């Protein structure tokens, strides 16, 4: 028993020494931050899956000794998890409303900043067999449409865009998140779905995106924030800075986001 | 009297090695329920119950679970009989197949249903082409998804009852000249009626709580395919208190129905 505890202590000491080395070695590299180590836990909206995974890898490469772990889910589910005490360092939300849930509960640290924005497009099967050109075409008889439920950010945006266009749409289904709506197009069960531009960019071999002017009236802003109870605050700040840096913006732009 | 003697003999001889884990197990199952009850917004409960979507989802849930159970009875009882009474090659494989939906994640079950009954599915394309029927995103689709997930519960319960039943009654009927169908309807069915009821109740309860296969195969549209579990999940996105209230309703309804059925029909002889 005692022997095991001693061994654990030695290992812990060795790890501390190692991470110290890592911090020293990093001074040679192009690291944008100062002596950041350890695990950074990022809670991010499902629509950020592809771009944040890329950014996380780049961040680890730029900051040896760090490890970024992600929890991707619907923004509202993440906000609930954070407010129930989940040990997260950073929260990146697909809508300001879900960020507000977290800051209102006193779990934010500082002010959230908008780092990206996303717009809706109509996802259609490859080649657009139904010839859908705009929101009005979605109400044609025989055209089945999936939208997100209004409780999630993409559904709220869809509702707004349809209202702006004056289109009264009865969808076949209101999906629980944007990826589920996209999946219904991929499976061929619906003829169109209202999803984010980034989701279409991420699935180029399965779907095409049809842009429509009303989407400019329903832009989703993505805020990011370091959390108050972040176990690794320095790491969290460095990650947020990286997302907003030139490197981070390049990844986000390539994925189809607009960066402010 | 025997009534008072039985519990005393039962309670005093419980070994600690069984009692402690049993109590822990009970606490593990009961505490989350207590958590729901403690966190429920009792003061605003009446207003929340009166919200229009709640009753619609509840009615749809009760209807679809009941129709799904009827469908399971229609198909599941003969299947259970086949498994219990007829020796045929590959019976073990068939029995294993029947239990697949038990271990399959329901969401995967939903995708599998789409691949068969969806617009591009093997059966779905034929249904749409011949009869103009499309099952996904319809109430019938909800019933199908629930029946797929719940039927194994019925088949296993009924098969167990059939295997436990005394076959001498059936043999006697046969020697008296009854055909196999007559024996089934007049002897076997009444004999295993309690088992069938128990299986149907389990099946109904499973169908009532079905989420994954339903949202994947039938989608989510209020009044048409949005059952209570789907309403709970979406309420959770914005309003946890609303989700707790919806869960409490579902809980109350299922406990009430199960308790009522238990007292009336499933008491062991």
Question: Where would I find each of the regions flagged by the language model?
Answer:
Chain B
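Membrane-water interface segments at the C-terminal ends of transmembrane alpha-helices
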Residues: 9-43, 52-163, 187, 191-212, ...
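Short coil/turn motifs that cap or connect alpha-helices
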Residues: 89, 179-180
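Short, charged juxtamembrane terminal tails flanking transmembrane helices
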Residues: 2-5, 263-269
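Glycine/proline-centered hinge or cleavage motifs at structural transition points of membrane proteins
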Residues: 176-178, 190
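Short glycine/proline-centered loop/turn elements that form peptide/ligand docking sites
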Residues: 165-169
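The alpha-helix within a helix-turn-helix
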Residues: 173
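Short hydrophobic, aromatic-rich alpha-helical segments embedded in or entering the lipid bilayer
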Residues: 221-234
């Amino acid at each position: 028993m005692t022997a095991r505890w001693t061994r654990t202590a030695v290992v812990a000491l060795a790890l501390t020494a190692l991470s110290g080395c890592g911090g020293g070695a990093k001074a040679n590299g192009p690291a944008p931050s100062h002596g950041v180590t350890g695990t950074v836990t990022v809670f991010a909206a499902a629509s950020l899956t592809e771009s944040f995974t890329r950014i996380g890898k780049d961040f680890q490469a730029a900051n040896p000794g760090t490890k970024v772990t992600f929890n991707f889910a619907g923004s509202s589910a993440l906000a609930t998890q954070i407010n129930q005490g989940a040990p997260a360092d950073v929260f990146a939300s697909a809508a300001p409303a879900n960020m507000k849930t977290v800051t209102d509960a006193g779990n934010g640290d500082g002010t959230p900043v908008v780092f990206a924005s996303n717009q809706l497009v109509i996802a259609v099967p490859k080649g657009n067999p139904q010839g859908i050109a705009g929101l009005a075409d979605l109400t044609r008889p025989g055209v089945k449409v999936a939208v997100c439920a209004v409780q999630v950010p993409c559904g709220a945006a869809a509702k707004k865009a349809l209202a702006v266009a004056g289109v009264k749409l009865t969808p076949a289904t209101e999906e629980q998140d944007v990826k589920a709506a996209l999946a219904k197009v991929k499976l061929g069960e619906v003829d169109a779905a209202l999803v984010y531009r980034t989701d279409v960019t991420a699935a180029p071999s399965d779907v095409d995106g049809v842009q429509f002017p009303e989407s400019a009236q329903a832009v989703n802003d993505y805020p990011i924030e370091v959390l108050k109870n972040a176990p690794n605050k320095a790491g969290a700040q460095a990650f947020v800075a990286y997302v907003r840096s030139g490197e981070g913006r390049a990844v986000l732009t390539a994925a189809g986001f607009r960066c402010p | 009297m025997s009534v008072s003697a039985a519990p005393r003999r039962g309670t005093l001889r419980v070994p600690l090695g069984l009692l402690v884990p049993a109590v822990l197990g009970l606490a593990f199952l009961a505490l989350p329920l207590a958590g729901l009850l403690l966190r429920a917004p009792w003061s605003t409960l009446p207003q929340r119950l009166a919200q229009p979507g709640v009753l619609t989802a509840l009615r749809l849930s009760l209807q679809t679970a009941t129709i799904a159970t009827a469908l399971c009875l229609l198909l599941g009882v003969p299947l259970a009989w086949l498994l219990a009474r007829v020796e045929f090659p590959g019976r073990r494989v068939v029995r294993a197949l029947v239990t697949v939906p038990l271990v399959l994640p329901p969401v995967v079950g939903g995708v599998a249903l789409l691949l068969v009954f969806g617009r591009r599915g093997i059966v779905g394309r034929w249904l749409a082409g011949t009869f103009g029927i499309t099952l996904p995103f319809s109430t019938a689709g909800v019933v199908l998804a629930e029946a797929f997930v719940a039927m194994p519960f019925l088949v296993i319960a009924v098969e167990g009852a059939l295997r436990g039943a005394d076959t001498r009654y059936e043999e006697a009927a046969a020697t008296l000249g009854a055909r196999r169908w007559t024996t089934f309807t007049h002897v076997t069915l009444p004999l295993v009626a309690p088992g069938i009821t128990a299986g149907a109740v389990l099946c109904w309860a499973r169908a009532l709580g079905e989420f994954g296969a339903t949202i994947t195969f039938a989608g989510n549209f209020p009044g048409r395919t949005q059952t209570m579990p789907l309403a709970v999940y979406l309420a959770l996105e914005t309003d946890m208190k609303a989700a707790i209230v919806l869960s409490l309703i579902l809980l109350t309804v299922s406990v009430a129905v199960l308790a009522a059925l238990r007292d009336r029909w499933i008491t062991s002889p």
